[in-house]
């Protein structure tokens, strides 16, 4: 998409300018060097900027970003714009522009905490790697980039958090919603281990399959998608594997309670099959 010429209202730094246009009373343009040597009243042609230019048009996001650049180093802002471009290029997807706020804010203040000697933990790290393998791999590369460019070594815990931001941005889902779904999955896993008296191997293929099923089950319930299963199969599972079947219904109760949406009966069949596979090992 070709961006039109804009008139600069204010230069926030060399990489961030507030502009206006006939069709956009106010827009924040982000791009390395876009504000260099510019002042209010100057015209800016995004096509003349070597690096990719991003737009923030949502008023709330504009307000959040203005506040963010008051506290974040200008070079870091420019570096994060490179990171966002790297994510788009690597995934071949457009990203939700909120990532400029969410990921920048998260990483900048995480590095501050690390400098102060504070520990960063992520109890859901293995699950995140299993649920979002592509995003996780990309997050590992971003952590390497940060180490190479900024000489800051982020802990492995951060790979998981960055992966969630990437997933949120590439699927246009609120990162809080993504985190909430992961918490529900974590609660379900704890319930499975308690009810079935098993300790699941977090590195096993069966566990990864279960996590993927739970992820899509939670997403289906959240969006109201129906899932059906033959009643004859459900009847056999109920009779042959009563503990797994009753546990499946308990898990559905967790989803219904946490998501405040009804869970289709068909989910019980597929959950029971996964649980039976776990207990038969």
Which residue ranges define each predicted feature?
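A cross-family "folded-core" feature that marks the main globular domain of proteins
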Residues: 2-281
């Amino acid at each position: 998409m070709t961006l039109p010429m804009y008139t600069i209202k204010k230069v926030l730094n060399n990489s961030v300018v507030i502009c206006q246009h006939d069709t956009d009373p106010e827009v924040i343009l982000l791009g390395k060097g876009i504000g260099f040597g510019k002042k209010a009243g100057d015209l800016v042609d995004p096509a003349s900027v070597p690096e990719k230019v991003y737009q923030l048009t949502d008023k709330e996001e504009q307000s959040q970003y203005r506040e963010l650049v008051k506290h974040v180093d200008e070079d870091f802002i420019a570096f994060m714009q490179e990171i966002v471009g790297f994510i788009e290029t690597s995934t071949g997807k457009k990203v939700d522009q909120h990532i400029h706020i969410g990921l920048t804010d998260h990483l900048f203040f995480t590095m501050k905490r690390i400098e102060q000697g504070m520990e960063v933990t992520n109890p859901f790290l293995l699950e995140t790697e299993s649920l979002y393998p592509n995003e996780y791999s990309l997050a590992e590369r971003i952590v390497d980039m940060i180490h190479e460019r900024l000489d800051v070594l982020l802990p492995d815990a951060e790979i998981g958090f960055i992966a969630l931001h990437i997933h949120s941005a590439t699927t246009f889902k609120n990162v809080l919603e993504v985190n909430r779904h992961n918490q529900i999955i974590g609660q379900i896993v704890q319930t499975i281990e308690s009810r079935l008296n098993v300790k699941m191997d977090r590195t096993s293929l069966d566990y990864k399959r279960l996590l993927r099923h739970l992820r899509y089950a939670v997403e289906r319930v959240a969006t109201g998608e129906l899932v059906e299963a033959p009643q004859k199969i459900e009847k056999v599972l109920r009779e042959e594997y009563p503990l797994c079947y009753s546990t499946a219904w308990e898990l559905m109760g967790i989803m219904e309670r946490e998501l405040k949406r009804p869970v289709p009966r068909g989910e019980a069949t597929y959950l029971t099959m996964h649980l039976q596979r776990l207990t038969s090992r």
